[in-house]
């Protein structure tokens, strides 16, 4: 099979491509015969394909399929018996072959940047048998590149920085553009760089894309940022080449090329003399056009009469010099100060020393203003002593204060009573002499810390404070006593001379040479036969037994008076009683029982007799309980004598709420008795504020009259009682509103006499309701007749 002839137009296109390709190697077509021949007993089959590679231009936009080339087999005699078959990459989809002629066409637009070549296979088949007449052969279709891709900056846009004042040619940044066209074919992918914007400050190397400074001494303080536009163009920058652009932002970084400078040669500030220590007097700042570390500076006072009075430090955030006060100001001593202050950069660049010096000086004058100051004591703390035996009015000491101002106003003194709540001391307002105002007790408070106030006579608001520590000197005014509450025991089997207790003493006083106590028994106890006392001469004493044979049954507790004397002048003494209990001890002398035991003597009764006595006692108790119970349960007869007085009570059934409070029983006989005067009954829910009116005694009159007077008397009491009316009474208000439909259900209307209700049936209810039937019945005697 061999490469066929091409059409004339296509041939011209191929010739033009070959002229553009310098040094391109193209394989010559080679022929091989399919006829085998034999040599030296060996058989070799020659290749029958004319093998080659085809070239086709990319981006073909014609309406007809693009002719690629022609395949031809030597077996093909041109009679149509041979059929050509194409397989491989893009076969049938991109490339098609004429099975009769072997012509290959491209049916789609090809892009070399997507795929640079296609590998295909071709074979000749017998049309009748569909069997290959030759082995399959492989060939390549290469896509010929055209300049259809512009250069692109894949990393753009760019940002870069370069120090200010850099020399010409200082590299800033390198930009790179890529072209997707074939770099091995022509100049389609050969890119050159140029600068479209940013001149004359910067330049770019055409081949490498390195951006460099083009002007010397660019000043950041004048302009700190530049925007560059860089172009990349293929075809070596020739006309007709494609191009792409990117932006580069170049920032000039700061260098220390500006020295600090004070805006003024001198400053003046006024401060009051009362300004506290560490207060800020002033803030000054030297201007520096640099930024960051290049603008950092330090301040120091290099000269002046305020070197020890003021100091200066740096505010790291604002780079200001902060002048603060170190010593208290006194207008009367000095009225002004002068300071020479230097500001200098901390990081100096040796390359720019010629622009210096990188420091500056200024003068600061501080004027001290007079302030009305409070009085000042001659001493911050006064220490005084006084004996606790000092009498009232004893002089303890003197304090002194003066007005530091030029006016020197008189000073008056007083004691801050918050520091002397008990008012133990007084002070003379004019002289400052401190005296005792009450008796002192060192044991209560050994040191008194008081505050003395000094005020100007002309301006009492100006107050100075002095502190006085008054120490109370001790005298021997407290007698010694036991150091603790002793619990002393002695065993019943104790032997004579046995130590049962060691005692010591304490004294609230504080003698200069320490305590020395002397112990002895009192005169009345010195000759006792039970115990003795031994003074150990070391502020302790030992209690010993004088005999043996202690018995709890005879005496369980002994009281031993001990006389203790101190060594003060004059000496004081006290008598302290030591309680000694007799105990039953074990073999080791450890107390087991110290309480007196009750010993029961034999009564001569047997156990059975004791049980019988106890049974009789229990029987008597049970009988007494039964008798009491029966008396309480004694029932009254069902039928009552009509003449017997009945104590009416309101009996509640199924009570769902609070009713009236008047549930007390009344003795009918008491109502008829002329000699009995009813006591005033007070309400339970309120406390009356006035006394009830006295009530007259009742005469012997009919029962209905008695009840009527009784009820009217109660109503009268309720009307005149200002505390609170009873639950069951008529209450008058300015406005009560509309009445309830159900009306009152909490009580009976005992005053109304116009009721239409017939209560005659109450007479049939028995003797219990006889009195109620008499009150509400229709008999001739009505309650309110």
Curated annotation (Swiss-Prot):
The chain crosses the membrane at residues 608-628. Glycans are attached at residues 449, 530. Keywords: Calcium, Cell adhesion, Cell membrane, Cleavage on pair of basic residues, Glycoprotein, Membrane, Metal-binding, Repeat, Signal, Transmembrane, Transmembrane helix. Residues 48-607 are extracellular. One of its GO terms (molecular function) is cadherin binding. GO terms for biological process: adherens junction organization; calcium-dependent cell-cell adhesion via plasma membrane cell adhesion molecules; cartilage condensation; cell migration; cell morphogenesis; cell-cell adhesion mediated by cadherin; cell-cell junction assembly; chondroblast differentiation. Residues 1-27 form the signal peptide. Pfam families: CADH_Y-type_LIR (PF01049), Cadherin (PF00028). Disulfide bonds: none annotated. The keyword Metal-binding applies. PROSITE patterns: CADHERIN_1, CADHERIN_2. The keyword Metal-binding applies. It is found in: Cell membrane. InterPro entries: Cadherin, Cadherin-like_dom, Cadherin-like_sf, Cadherin_CS, Cadherin_Y-type_LIR, Catenin-bd_sf. It is a single-pass type I membrane protein. Residues 28-47 form a propeptide. Residues 49-153, 154-262, 263-377, 378-482, 482-599 form the Cadherin domain. Its main location: membrane. Residues 629-785 are cytoplasmic. Three calcium ions are usually bound at the interface of each cadherin domain and rigidify the connections, imparting a strong curvature to the full-length ectodomain. Cadherins are calcium-dependent cell adhesion proteins. They preferentially interact with themselves in a homophilic manner in connecting cells; cadherins may thus contribute to the sorting of heterogeneous cell types. This is Cadherin-7. The lineage of its organism: Eukaryota, Metazoa, Chordata, Craniata, Vertebrata.
């Amino acid at each position: 099979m061999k490469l066929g002839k091409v059409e004339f137009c296509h041939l011209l296109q191929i010739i033009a491509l070959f002229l553009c390709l310098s040094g391109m190697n193209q394989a010559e077509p080679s022929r091989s015969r399919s006829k085998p021949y034999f040599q030296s007993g060996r058989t070799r089959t020659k290749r029958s394909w004319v093998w080659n590679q085809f070239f086709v231009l990319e981006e073909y936009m014609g309406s007809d399929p693009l002719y690629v080339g022609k395949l031809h087999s030597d077996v093909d005699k041109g009679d149509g018996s041979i059929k050509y078959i194409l397989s491989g990459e893009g076969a049938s989809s991109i490339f098609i072959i004429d099975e009769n002629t072997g012509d290959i066409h491209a049916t789609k637009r090809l892009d070399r940047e997507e795929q640079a070549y296609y590998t295909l296979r071709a074979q000749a088949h017998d049309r009748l048998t569909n069997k290959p007449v030759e082995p399959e052969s492989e060939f390549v279709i290469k896509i010929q590149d055209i300049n259809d891709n512009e250069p692109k900056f894949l990393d753009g846009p760019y940002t870069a920085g370069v120090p200010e004042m850099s020399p010409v040619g200082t590299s800033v940044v390198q930009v790179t553009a890529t072209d997707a066209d074939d770099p091995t074919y022509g100049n389609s992918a050969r890119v050159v760089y140029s600068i479209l914007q940013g001149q004359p400050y910067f330049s770019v190397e055409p081949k490498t894309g390195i951006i460099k400074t083009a002007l010397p001494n660019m000043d950041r303080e004048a302009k700190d940022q530049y925007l560059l536009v860089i172009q990349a163009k293929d075809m070596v920058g020739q006309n007709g080449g494609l191009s792409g652009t990117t932006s580069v932002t170049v920032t000039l970084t700061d260098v220390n090329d500006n020295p600090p400078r004070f805006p003024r040669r001198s400053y003046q500030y006024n401060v009051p003399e009362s300004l506290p220590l560490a207060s800020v007097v002033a803030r000054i700042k030297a201007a520096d056009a640099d930024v960051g570390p290049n603008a950092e500076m330090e301040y120091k006072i290099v000269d002046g009469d305020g070197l020890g009075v003021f100091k200066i430090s740096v505010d790291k955030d604002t780079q200001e010099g902060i002048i603060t006060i170190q010593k208290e100001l006194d207008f009367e001593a000095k009225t002004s100060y002068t300071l020479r202050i230097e500001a200098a950069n901390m990081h100096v660049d040796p390359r720019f020393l010629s622009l210096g010096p990188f420091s500056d000086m200024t003068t600061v004058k501080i004027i001290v203003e007079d302030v009305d100051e409070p009085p000042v004591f001659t001493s911050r703390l006064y220490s005084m002593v006084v004996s606790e035996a000092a009498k009232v009015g004893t002089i303890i000491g003197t304090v002194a204060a003066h007005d530091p101002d030029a006016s020197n106003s008189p000073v008056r003194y007083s004691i801050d009573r918050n520091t002397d709540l008990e008012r133990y001391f007084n002070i003379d307002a004019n002289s400052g002499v401190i005296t005792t105002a009450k008796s002192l007790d060192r044991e209560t408070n050994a040191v008194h810390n008081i505050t003395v106030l000094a005020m100007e006579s002309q301006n009492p608001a100006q107050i100075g404070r002095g502190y006085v520590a008054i120490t109370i000197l001790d005298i021997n005014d407290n007698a010694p006593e036991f150091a603790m509450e002793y619990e002393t025991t002695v065993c019943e089997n104790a032997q004579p001379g046995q130590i049962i207790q060691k005692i010591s003493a304490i004294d609230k006083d504080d003698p200069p040479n320490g305590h020395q106590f002397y112990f002895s028994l009192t005169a009345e106890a010195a000759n006792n036969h039970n115990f003795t006392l031994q003074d150990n001469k070391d502020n302790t004493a030992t209690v010993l037994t004088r005999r043996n044979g202690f018995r709890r049954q005879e005496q369980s507790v002994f009281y031993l008076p001990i006389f203790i004397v101190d060594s003060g002048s004059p000496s004081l003494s006290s008598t302290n009683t030591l309680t000694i209990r007799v105990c039953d001890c074990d073999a080791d002398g450890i107390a087991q029982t110290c309480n007196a035991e009750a010993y029961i003597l034999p009564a001569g009764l047997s156990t059975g007799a004791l049980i019988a006595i106890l049974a009789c006692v229990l029987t008597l108790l049970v009988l007494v309980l039964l008798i009491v119970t029966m008396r309480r349960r004694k029932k009254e007869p069902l039928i009552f004598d009509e003449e017997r007085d009945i104590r009416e009570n309101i009996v509640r059934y199924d009570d769902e709420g609070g009713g009236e409070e008047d549930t007390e029983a009344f003795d009918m006989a008491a109502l008829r008795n002329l000699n009995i005067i009813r006591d005033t009954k007070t309400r339970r829910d309120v406390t009356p504020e006035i006394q009830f009116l006295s009530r007259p005694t009742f005469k012997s009159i009919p029962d209905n009259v008695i009840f009527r007077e009784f009820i009217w008397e109660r109503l009268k009491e309720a009307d005149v009682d200002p505390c609170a009316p009873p639950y069951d009474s008529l209450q008058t208000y300015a406005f009560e509103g509309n009445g309830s439909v159900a009306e009152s259900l909490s009580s009976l209307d005992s005053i109304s006499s116009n009721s239409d209700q017939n209560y005659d049936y109450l007479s049939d209810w028995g003797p219990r309701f006889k009195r109620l039937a008499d009150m509400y019945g229709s008999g001739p005697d009505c309650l309110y007749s």
